[in-house]
């Protein structure tokens, strides 16, 4: 995987917003909270400045404005760091988007521990638990550029609230864009193996693939399963793994409490 091209999924997010708008998604609007350079919505702003709204450091207000615009037929993508949009904006997401089941997409970048030098205050390891608790909320956690692009398109096409989780760091692009097909609610087997099953999501998927390579050198065959949808989760692929292997390891940048 060392030779693979690396792209941060937050960059994939910004690029795909532009592609959607170019292809006729005239109802797509993008919101940010003074972090457009980091969330990469600046890519969209440069080409469609009249459809990009910077709400300043006011995540709760941003969520409320986006909810209101969705009632007028727009499809808002709300963007900020996971800690800020899911943490600071939780009440508004719950009451203004989740409760009325509005068609708003929440794009959370810089999720998990891999935020690194941004520090502990920015390392969000609670967002998936918060978003899973909201009835009707779809949660997507893509692993590479190809999957992230497909997830953004799927989120736009889906009529309802979606939480998209993106990484700060660049990750290897291991999917083939010519053959990969994304479907909400479906996991994906990446490697064969009959000793251990590893179920990973997001940034941890390429780490699981690297671990599988190292384990193979020691005679251990790992089946790596990519779980790009956290909710609704692919129960079938999990139950199959439980029936076929005695050991299942889950890998995620998130608290398991």
Predicted segments — roles?
Residues 1-165, 167-257:
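Thiamine diphosphate
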């Amino acid at each position: 995987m060392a030779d693979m091209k690396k792209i941060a999924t937050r960059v994939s997010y910004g690029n795909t917003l532009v592609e959607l708008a170019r292809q006729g998604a005239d109802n797509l609007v993008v919101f940010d909270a003074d972090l457009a350079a980091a969330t990469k919505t600046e890519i969209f702003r440069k080409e469609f400045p009249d459809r990009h709204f910077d709400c300043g450091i006011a995540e709760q207000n941003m969520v409320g404005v986006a909810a209101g615009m969705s009632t007028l037929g727009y499809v808002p993508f709300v963007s900020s760091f996971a800690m800020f949009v899911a943490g600071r904006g939780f009440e508004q997401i719950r009451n203004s988007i989740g409760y009325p089941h509005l068609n708003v997409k929440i794009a959370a970048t810089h999720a998990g521990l891999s935020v690194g030098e941004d520090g502990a205050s920015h390392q969000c390891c609670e967002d998936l638990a918060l978003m899973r608790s909201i009835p009707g909320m779809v949660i997507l956690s893509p692993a590479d550029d190809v999957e992230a692009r497909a997830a953004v398109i799927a989120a736009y096409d889906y009529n309802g609230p979606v939480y998209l989780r993106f990484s700060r760091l660049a990750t290897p692009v291991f999917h083939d864009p010519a053959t990969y097909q994304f479907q909400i609610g479906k996991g994906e087997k990446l490697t064969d193996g009959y000793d251990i099953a590893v179920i990973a999501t997001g940034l941890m998927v390429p780490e699981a693939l690297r671990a599988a390579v190292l384990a193979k050198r020691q005679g251990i065959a790992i089946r790596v399963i990519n779980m790009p949808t956290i909710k609704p989760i692919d129960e079938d692929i999990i139950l199959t793994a439980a029936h076929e292997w005695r050991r299942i390891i889950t890998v995620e940048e998130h608290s398991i409490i």
